[in-house]
Amino acid sequence: MKIQLIAVGTKMPDWVTTGFNEYQRRFPKDMPLELLEIPAGKRGKNADIARILEKEGEQALAAVGKSSRIVTLDLPGKNWTTPQLAQQLESWKQDGRDVALLIGGPEGLSPACKAAAEQSWCLSALTMPHPLVRIVVAESLYRAWSLTTNHPYHRE
């Protein structure tokens, strides 16, 4: 099973790339974590935010692998503990499909992305900068994987 992290925004600061890459390299070969960046639409004083969201959503959905399970990261989503995320990871593996996790831009995800999702995950009720979300998701998934394989990274 491959996990795609599809995120709106490019040209992240070095600390984001370093942090994400640290967890990405730890994933096993049979469950690689891949980052796909979608360019954010130009936001300005007179920007049509609905149109920007729509375009970002179209690009994000086009990047999703065929037959992949789509999971959005969104506030109304489920708030999983680490053991619950580990159970989700196992369930996704049993399903046999790849997983595409969608992270929106400053205004979130398009209605089309939300409608296409089979699940929605609320990472936190806190507002986080989108660059940080990439690292937190990568670490959370790695921690969940370590729990499912009895790897010593996660401790109760």
Curated annotation (Swiss-Prot):
Keywords linked to the UniProt accession: Cytoplasm, Methyltransferase, rRNA processing, S-adenosyl-L-methionine, Transferase
Binding site for S-adenosyl-L-methionine: L73, G104, L123, S124, A125, L126, T127, M128
Subcellular location: Cytoplasm
GO terms, molecular function: rRNA (pseudouridine-N3-)-methyltransferase activity
Stored Pfam families: SPOUT_MTase (PF02590)
EC numbers on record: 2.1.1.177
Methyltransferase in keyword set: yes
CDD domains referenced in this protein's UniProt entry, alphabetically: RlmH-like
Any single Gene Ontology cellular-component annotation: cytoplasm
InterPro entries: Alpha/beta_knot_MTases (IPR029028), RlmH-like (IPR003742), tRNA_m1G_MTases_N (IPR029026)
Domain of life, per lineage: Bacteria
Family that this chain belongs to: Belongs to the RNA methyltransferase RlmH family.
Protein name: Ribosomal RNA large subunit methyltransferase H
Source species: Tolumonas auensis (strain DSM 9187 / NBRC 110442 / TA 4)
